[in-house]
Amino acid sequence: MRLVIAEKPSVAKSLAAVLGAATRKDGYLEGGGWLVSWCLGHLAGLADAATYNPDYAKWRYDDLPILPESWRFTIAKDKRDQFDVLRTLLRREDVTEVVNACDAGREGELIFRTVYCLAGCQKPMKRLWISSMEDSAIREGFANLRPGADYDGLHQAALCRAKADWLVGINATRLFSVLYHRTLNIGRVMSPTLALIVQREAEIDAFKPVPFYSVALDLPGFTAASARMDKKADAEQLKTACQGGTVTVKQVERRDKIREAARPL
């Protein structure tokens, strides 16, 4: 029996339909020599600081920085039942191989590996790596399963990202909140993004409009405009020179241009 673990129920159902696992069970599908189950996104995550030391429940400057020597994980309370299903399946004696069918990416790798490790599973692991949910793509993916070890680096990268988020979020949030006597959430991604917004707002506030002038000629079928000029007198001079004259089109050039959407701020 081979166990397939997808990242979400909808994906698991699509995989099961192709594999012939049509019998619905509690938290998984079975059939054709396959067990197909699913996570619900991240079933587990890095534990909060208070898990390491109850004293960390209170935010104090003297406790910083908080640097776990051995990282711990906790199961999300609202997802405990599905984790128990997966753990039971992973420990079944008739399951000889596990297929990681979570999303093809860094986070998908972390979602599966976390469950796999917390369940204490050491069974052979394969990786399904597909970018399409078409039946043909699924069949091809299962025909070309890769060794799970090929993606150890991806798992380590995802775990590094998660730990970096934890270290910055826990320590910086507590530091600034204690110093300024108010809750100030700091994040590895959130704070730089907020800084970009603040910087843009400052640019808008400092903007000073500068007048400019140009001369436009209304011609049959199109309008021809001059370059911008800083001085009105220069524009008036060009306007006077054009009045009563004859326009000759010497060259026509057509180009497709992509106009980017205006920035939200």
Where would I find each of the regions flagged by the language model?
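Alpha-helical hydrophobic/aromatic positions enriched in membrane-embedded helices and signal peptides
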Residues: 157, 182-184
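Conserved, well-folded catalytic cores of nucleic-acid-processing
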Residues: 18-22, 46, 89, 118-122, ...
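Intrinsically disordered, low-complexity regulatory segments
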Residues: 1-162, 166
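Long, highly charged, low-complexity internal segments
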Residues: 43-77, 88, 184-265
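Short flexible coil/turn linkers enriched for glycine and charged/polar residues
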Residues: 92-94, 170, 209
